[in-house]
Amino acid sequence: MKKYELVADKIKAYITKNKLHHGDKLPTITELMKEYQVGKSTILQAITLLTQRGIVYKVQGSGVFVRPTGRDGYMSLTDNAGFAHVLKDPTTEVIEFAEKRPPKPLCDYLHSDEVCYFIKRLRRQEGKPFVLEESYYPKSIIPFMSKEIAEGSIFDYIKDGLKKEIRFSDKYMRVRKLRADEAKYLELEEGDPCLEVYDTFYLANGTPFDSSKLVYNYQNSKFYDQSSDDIISVSYTHLRA
């Protein structure tokens, strides 16, 4: 994990510990530098990361302020940090662990049809199934994987164990009806609605390392999204009445 990411996590923990609410102001850049014993550029990178995650916002000339927190039990559609930090009592069941080539369209997202680690998992929150997940990790990029690792946080293993930096993702979503095999795992009926998400995650150099299909239980999954604190400029010449 990069130094600015560690600092960002510490600032987020500070917000939680001190029960800061929407509109509360963070310490100044100078105060944060002194508190965490890092340079100005590291603090600015950490603030930028927190801004992108929808945790804080900047007001020019005034400082950095806390944004509203997400509701309990809601998962961010755009956060790449995984489920564990937002869900209550999450558990993971590894249904299948194998080595195989990905099918279309997953091999297209990976730009490769090489042999991958294939992991099929059922994720639960407070004992209730909320997502069925099928993931492919190219062996040329993720050289080692095990069922034991898959039972925990794969992303923590990639970041902390393999020292790889996870940067961004592409998501394609649609609503459809459940197949019989999916319904069995999600404890629903065949033909019930679901949200299907195709996820591709990339390393810092732009290499795709994870292509996944996630099928969400419509009864046990709730989502939210927050735009980042970017200045949006609108050209009124393009607006129509």
Protein language model regions, located:
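Basic, helix-initiating cap at the start of DNA-binding domains
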Residues: 1-9
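Conserved small/polar residues in nucleotide/adenosyl-binding loops
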Residues: 237-241
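Residue-level marker of alpha-helix boundaries and capping positions
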Residues: 2, 37-38, 145
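All-alpha effector-binding/dimerization core of bacterial HTH-type transcriptional repressors
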Residues: 68-235
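N-terminal helix-turn-helix
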Residues: 10-66
